[in-house]
Amino acid sequence: MSGYSRRKFLTRASCGAMSVVVGARSLQAAVSGNDLDEFIEAEMQGQRIPGLAACIVKSGKIVWSKGYGWSRVKRHVAMDPDRTIQNIGSISKTVTATAVMQLWEKGKFELDDDINNYLPFSVRNPSHPDKPISFRCLLTHRSSIADSPAYMSSYACGDPRVSLETWIKDYFIPDGRYYRREVNFHPWSPGKKHRYSNVGFGLLGYLVEKLSGESFTKFTKRTILDPLGMKTTGWMLSEIASESHAVPYVPVNDGQVNKVLQAYKKVGILGGEVERDPVRGSYQPVCLYSFPNYPDGLVRTGVNQLARFLLAYVNHGVYGGARILEADTVQLMLTRQNATTPHQGLCWATLPHEGQPHWFHDGSDPGIRTSMSFRPSDGVGAIVFINRTDVDLKKFNERLYRESARF
């Protein structure tokens, strides 16, 4: 499946026997066939991937999960679908969208309402001041809100240094620190065109705070993460066990990522001693970073933890006896919202694969690449986490769906 990525970071303003060491395995891995292992290991060597964890879900449960390679190359810490945590990029948007739709279910707003009715300040595209931006516009990337250079430069090591509220106000209020009308907004009116917007999802996170009266992190923990039993998942480094966090990497001596290396150095998140793997090459570590617009991409979790969230969508809003959304709400989110953008639902996107629709979201950020998807027709889904930048996930996803027939 082709990706629906967060972005190419800082490059676009908007998505035979091998001696590869296999990392820790989950209980389900005992049923793994050698062919799948060999395929994954060969792809990891070919794409210079330090570590990978993945799972297949089917019949309402995880039927296979396994880790390969290293979450921390120098220390030889194995990638593990149970224990390894990493930031998952734009897959996080599905958690944010879930929180938004929980509030919609409670009657807090209507999807086509003007968001200004729920904000303490006005958000308008200055080129179209009379055209409101709706919740639906934000959830379908039709808000006309752009990701400016200020957004691209907001990454820093550690947890965010400013609050979500401060960031959002500085971005949208005309006298704010980051307000630049010519780069914070596209020239077209809200609703007219589809253009991926990370800042738009930060704004949705802020709206969750205003509508719920709670911080975004507390609301999502109370209504999504805790009910699903995602006990080791969080948004902030302070909320998770940092020793379990995979190190994000970029490969060195690779002409395709030289510009990426320079971009990461510019914002101060790349550094440290080069770490070497005898099979897959050398890597430059990226620090454990964050950004103030975090509702658009900063969930930190493990593969098997995230599978609980995915299975809730597969099972029409419920997992393990905990309902996070009504079935009709899930169906609405997995419905095409605009004829001119037939792949786009509410946050989730769809593409056909072997003649059947798959709903998915990918993630891409410095040192990570991720994907989460499922096929509603039979409830089969897959998750892939990788701790390096700019990896093609299509082959991995296609192979996992093919392997699902064995279970």
Indicate residue ranges for each PLM-predicted region.
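N-terminal secretory signal peptides and thylakoid transit peptides that target proteins
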Residues: 1-17
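Sec/Tat signal peptide C-region and signal peptidase I cleavage site
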Residues: 25-28
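Short, conserved catalytic-motif segment at the N-terminal edge
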Residues: 31-86, 110, 177-187, 356
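Short active-site loop at a secondary-structure junction
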Residues: 46-53, 75-138, 185-200, 294-297, ...
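A short acidic/small-residue loop/turn micro-motif
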Residues: 70-73, 366, 389-391
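Short, surface-exposed loop or secondary-structure junction motifs
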Residues: 72, 127-359, 364
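Short, gly/Ser/Thr-rich active-site loops of penicillin-recognizing serine hydrolases
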Residues: 354-357, 384-407
